[in-house]
Amino acid sequence: MASLLLAATLLSSDMAAQEKYVYNEFYFQRSSLFSELPVGKKDIVFLGDSQTNGCEWHELLGMKNVKNRGISSDVIQGFIDRVDPIVDGQPAKVFILGGVNDISHDLTPDSLCTSMEKLIVKIKQGSPRTKIYLQSLLPIDNSFGRYRKMVGKEQVIVETNRLYKEMAERHGVTWIDLYSKMVDPVTGSMRKGLTNDGLHLLGAGYLVWRDAVLPYVKK
């Protein structure tokens, strides 16, 4: 997550922040591979960052037509910059999860929602037949002490999810609440046993994720 560099320049107090991203080597390695791999009209695409990247989705879901398009350290602007090969393939479904790396760079919930909306509009305009599913950000657990840039960001995640859900409803996009299925209601952190670093999932976490999305994947 920390290996992706971001520089944000505020143009003025009444204008949105403009973000410029310098992507790491892994971003280009993986995105260049994705540009060579075909996406078909029957395919189901999972688009995201390291949390998506870390799963063998076709095996977990038992479906050969599921494509993993996750890149570790990626941000929402990165999704926008590399989504064209997905859109060109006119897939049946796209499941999106992203924003935690943006939060680590101190972007606001409003900024994240604006970027996510741009991504969704781009997909809808380029591939109207594609069904889009926006998944909530996952809870974190700062007790591991691994990601100092995420310290104190629990409520930013909650607020971003609120804005994401409202935006998804405006655009007729299906909202999938992963957060409530993984959060400890007492501590507000990710449930024990789902992560071993406070951010990325263990196998048990991916099973929770699978159970949440499977009805939509099979639909």
Each language-model region and where it sits:
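Acidic/histidine-rich helix-loop elements
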Residues: K20-Y21, G62-I76, S104, G198
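Charged helix-capping and loop-helix junction motifs
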Residues: P109-L119, I157-T160
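Oxyanion-hole/transition-state-stabilizing segment in secreted/luminal serine hydrolases
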Residues: L47, T52-N65, Q77-T114, Y133, ...
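N-terminal secretory targeting modules
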Residues: M1-V45, N53, W57, K218
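Catalytic His-Asp segment of secreted/periplasmic serine-dependent ester chemistry enzymes
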Residues: P139-K219
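Surface-exposed amphipathic alpha-helices with a cationic face
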Residues: I120-K124
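Conserved beta-strand scaffold positions in the cores of enzyme catalytic domains, especially
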Residues: F46, V66-N68, W175
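A short helix->loop->beta-strand "cap" motif at the edges of active sites that frequently abuts
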Residues: S127-K131
